[in-house]
């Protein structure tokens, strides 16, 4: 039976039990000693594919560790899970859906059936629709109600309709096309809306409403506010269709809003929001960087898809990263994972991965509904280097928590300034080196004596200078941030997340916790506004509602 119907209890697999024993054997393992004893450790534990170099040599692993982790993947039927994903089986068991985001970057000519229909022609039809729209806007043919060309595009969406597109359009800023500026409106906070629209001219602004249901609370409220702003600023209602387009599966609601049928782009139920930047949800990306660069992004993701499905497990970049995550989460007690991009243009990468990973693998039951008694998805956090070095890296180096980290860095910068990039790259490497190597008590004492301190001062300060080391990290290196390797990078993490979900036996494609919060939010709103006189079900919520009602002046 398929893994998504009857997943394994991995704790009963022989490889899991062997890994538990191996973990005990690794109690005294030292990465510093491992490097000293093996000059080829980097060569043995690194991998180059799709424009990305993965150095995973600074991990708490031996050849035996990897052998056992690969055995775990095999015994958990990972090959079958990957095949099920790509064949369009209903791997999202709780919602009875396939998860075919990979089809969005498949080249024309391939064939993939969903409910008996080949979806690849439809995917490329929509891509052609995106191409045509982008061409009209970039050429100045699409004009607003006053016949001025569109110069500002505002994407209204939240979650996957926002985080992925924002990440890519910001990361590929050097590829930005002239003439059109893209903005993002996500939060249901009037301050964000006011600050954005204060900089816009309604005559030259186009809004993209990105919502599968055309009813997501934050997106709908911001869309209604945008329409009110457009009308208040003098925009005629009969010309609304020139200033609003939609990416949605609810065509009826979009048409009722005033959006022209020809300006509605479809969404499919086999694409989850956090995996949707490759679809028409990526329209703001294509507007920002141009269609040819958007297609390069798709090509990079497709290259990673091919690597993922064809490379042996022991040479498979997403699989190796996923297994290392399982190793630390389930056998070393790690509860979080740091994402540390050393590039200004990747400053939003961590935010995208937070949704991708935590919304996918933050689960506590298996696909069949049986409870898990092991940890699953870790907390994803981090930020851009070198800023983090002067903030939270202290915890990574000397804290009591084990926090595996991924460093991401390009070799070349689009903006060379003196020797800045050499220093940036050096800091990235040295942070990973310091996490691995640390500083012993003896080294700390020698360092302090060399500074001329008295022996009493040496003994007083030495404990504070000791850095434990042996902290694991990966380093991902690319030539420079470009559409192809960025597509590969994002797809790499998508596949990593899926592999972990398959091993844990959980559903990476639903998010029922998010849905509960939405439902309860409606109830609280009714009480806040006085529409419901019933008290909240707990005293804390009721007390805060009463405080709001007594103080609110909005």
UniProtKB/Swiss-Prot annotation:
Q: Where is the active site?
A: 359, 390, 518
Give a single Pfam family match: PGI
Q: Which Gene3D superfamilies match?
A: 1.10.1390.10, Glucose-6-phosphate isomerase like protein, domain 1
Kindly state which keywords UniProt assigns to this record, in alphabetical order. Answer: Cytoplasm, Gluconeogenesis, Glycolysis, Isomerase
Q: Catalyses which reaction?
A: alpha-D-glucose 6-phosphate = beta-D-fructose 6-phosphate
**What terms describe the molecular function in GO for this protein?**
carbohydrate derivative binding; glucose-6-phosphate isomerase activity; monosaccharide binding
Indicate where this protein is primarily found: cytoplasm
Supply the enzyme class, top level: isomerase
Sorted alphabetically, which InterPro entries does this protein's record hold?
A: G6P_Isomerase, G6P_Isomerase_C, Phosphoglucose_isomerase_CS, SIS_dom_sf, SIS_PGI_1, SIS_PGI_2
Which cellular components does GO assign to this protein? Answer: cytosol
EC assignment: the record states 5.3.1.9
Q: What is its pathway?
A: Carbohydrate biosynthesis; gluconeogenesis; Carbohydrate degradation; glycolysis; D-glyceraldehyde 3-phosphate and glycerone phosphate from D-glucose: step 2/4
Cellular compartments annotated: Cytoplasm
GO process terms (BP): gluconeogenesis; glucose 6-phosphate metabolic process; glycolytic process
- Record has Endoplasmic reticulum as a keyword: no
Q: Which family does it belong to?
A: Belongs to the GPI family.
* PANTHER family linked: GLUCOSE-6-PHOSPHATE ISOMERASE
* Record function comment: Catalyzes the reversible isomerization of glucose-6-phosphate to fructose-6-phosphate.
Q: Supply the name of the protein.
A: Glucose-6-phosphate isomerase
Starting at the broadest rank, the lineage of the source organism is: Bacteria, Pseudomonadati, Pseudomonadota, Gammaproteobacteria, Pseudomonadales
